[in-house]
Amino acid sequence: MKFVIKSISKNSGRLGQLRIGKESNELQTPLLMQTTKGGSIPYLSGDVFDSVCKGQQQQQLLQLTLSTMDQMAESLVQWNRSLSEYVGLPGHATVLLLRDPCETTPAGGNDRDVVPLFTRRGKESLTATRYLELVSSFAPDVYQGLCDADTNPDSTKKRVQKSVDRTERFMEQCYERRVENSTLLAPIVGGYNTFARTQSIKHARQQPAGSYGGYILEGFHSNGLAATELKATQLLPIVEHCVQQLEEEQPRLMPGAYTPLLMLELIRQGIDIFDTSYAYCAAVNYKALSFSYKLDEIRPDDEHTPLLDMTAEEYKEQFKPLLSGCTCLACEKHTRAYHHHLYKTHELLGPILLMIHNLHHLMGFFDVIRASIGTDQLPALLEHLRMQNTSTEINYRIEPNNKIVTKAAMGKGFIAPAV
């Protein structure tokens, strides 16, 4: 993996080019990894995903997770082609992570020599040896080092220190037995403790040159919707502390469903790679992304919401697209009323269309981010996203959908509210 910085600005972050593998195209950073579940883009077939990516970078970076794919390791040993071909998305680069950023990772299960892997079949205890065997079976282009990232804003100092000490022990084996033809990402852990983060960084930086090809910053949240609830005042000082001690020539990755506003703040601090788990978390909770990311865009006063809750009764008679001017399939062919109807009738097409729209919207957002960095306008975009032309700061947190639709409550025409 080769990373080249094209431009860097104190106020707007940095632009870069990432080349993964000898025959890959150059990926422009800041970059969105495509979150997958079991190797598939959630709700989307390969053809639909290709149509969503039309007009974007030809090659995408697929984020694969061991917690949703570990059962494939045995068959992958017999596979003599690329991992992206195995999952039916040929031509794309792959990065293998340990945990699914879309789902809350249960706490506990960590021990001196093992890390818990929570799968659909239950918990498996991974030693460093077993982990490296699995990575060798998958043979991804990029993989993260084994780490104890079971920390969040509420973690105690003792739990944080244990996570750093255990990660150092795991990484000694990962550095010693690097997987051939794959790039290792060095994990930086330590919760919200600056001393622990510094210890983790020092351990990575004291390794011989070429031991790893980038950094993955973890241990800030428990994945799932918890990432959308993080406070910028708590997270940003820790990330800034870490970035100041990392080499500029190495890419920096932060997985998780961070809000668009927080992603902008992190990009401004020098983080290069994120994922699309925010789009998935919104879709699975029947939310459509609707925030404005164009500086010259002017909307009516009632159109400043960052998320449309398609479970709300107000949309049952709104015969207009999710977002005016959006060119995705969900907006060009369907109305808000239809999306609300799909929710009420439990149709699988509902989250499919929302995922199409949310991915399209988030990818367009990153196109604008890269253009804004190039013209040093990221601060203006950040302010636009924070206020959305209103007088109050916008909240991008995703609320879980706890409504239950029953036949008894709907009546004729499905007009009764959900209970």
Swiss-Prot record:
It is found in: Cytoplasm. InterPro entries: QTRTD1 (IPR028592), Queuine_tRNA-ribosyltrfase (IPR050852), TGT-like_sf (IPR036511), tRNA_ribo_trans-like (IPR002616). One of its GO terms (cellular component) is cytoplasm. Disulfide bonds: none annotated. Keywords: Cytoplasm, Metal-binding, tRNA processing, Zinc. The keyword Metal-binding applies. It comes from the Eukaryota. Signal peptide: none annotated. Coiled coil: none annotated. Pfam families: TGT. Its cofactor is Zn(2+). Non-catalytic subunit of the queuine tRNA-ribosyltransferase (TGT) that catalyzes the base-exchange of a guanine (G) residue with queuine (Q) at position 34 (anticodon wobble position) in tRNAs with GU(N) anticodons (tRNA-Asp, -Asn, -His and -Tyr), resulting in the hypermodified nucleoside queuosine (7-(((4,5-cis-dihydroxy-2-cyclopenten-1-yl)amino)methyl)-7-deazaguanosine). Belongs to the queuine tRNA-ribosyltransferase family. QTRT2 subfamily. Heterodimer of a catalytic subunit and an accessory subunit. This is Queuine tRNA-ribosyltransferase accessory subunit 2. It comes from Drosophila grimshawi (Hawaiian fruit fly).
